[in-house]
Amino acid sequence: MIDSVDPTKNFNPLWRAIFSGEHPELRRGRKMFRLMSPTAHDRCRLCYAGFDGFSAPVMRAIGRGQWLRNPHFCEKCESVLAQERGGAEIEIAMLYADVRGSTQLAAGMRPAEFAALMQRFFQTAIKIFTWTDAIVDKMVGDEVIGIYVPCLTGPDYRQRAVAAGLKLLRATGHADPAGPWLSIGVGVHSGETFMGSIGVEGGNYQFAALGDTMNLGARLVGAAKGGELIMSATVWNDVSGEISAEPRSLELKGYAERVTAYVARIQ
């Protein structure tokens, strides 16, 4: 029998302060690192430590070099967040992208060849996520997930998520006359999620985004055919004046009612 769960146990005021940019130590740190790295153009999105310019070697020496998984953050900020248990409920946009027909692809290739193809896909996705100010949430199997947090990405976080999805479709060759080098589908949704560091007491913890919003995003990408970006109505309302899309009524697993989504393709 599962014990009852207190939903407030995982809430942490530090995470809320970080996501809002109002944490006092964060404000002091940003002021200090701006002074220490006056020539930096690329900075940690949390503490503002400079990743380039004349102070970059010093930043690396004190543990403020770029975190490899998410180049928008320094290694120190990542370690602090990983150790700070709990999180906060915040509004985000998420982008899911996964490979179409990966089982058949893997069956027709040597394991090393398939691994190289997935590596190319992940590298392409991460580069686009970096350009559009996303957090790389997960790279699992044949799927990659990017998270767009307003306090880090800006008020146009939904538009950036859609732009990233379209860039990824183009980068994988879906606009090429010869066809894509890898067929993928993309799903974009937005809403409130729980974001923070979760895991087992005394065991491993990881940074994660959880909730029904994430589940719906996963269902949307599952409904996308190769070359399609399927977005929820929430996202479409923000980008309808910028791109073309057609409505599609979807029957999604786990949802009692059909969901109206919008399908965009590379022109």
Language-model region placement:
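Alpha-helix/helix-capping structural signal
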Residues: 100, 192-193, 215, 234
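Catalytic NTP-binding/metal-coordinating core of nucleotidyl cyclase/transferase enzymes
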Residues: 84-163
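Cytosolic regulatory/linker segments at or just downstream of nucleotide-handling modules
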Residues: 225-267
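Catalytic core of nucleotidyl cyclases, primarily class III adenylyl/guanylyl cyclases
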Residues: 128-160, 171-212, 260
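Short amphipathic alpha-helical segments
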Residues: 41, 45, 71, 75, ...
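Regulatory cytosolic signal-relay segments
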Residues: 1-90
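Conserved, well-folded catalytic cores of nucleic-acid-processing
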Residues: 168-171, 175, 201, 219, ...
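A residue-level structural signature of the nucleotidyltransferase/glycosyltransferase Rossmann-like core
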Residues: 94, 185-186, 228, 261
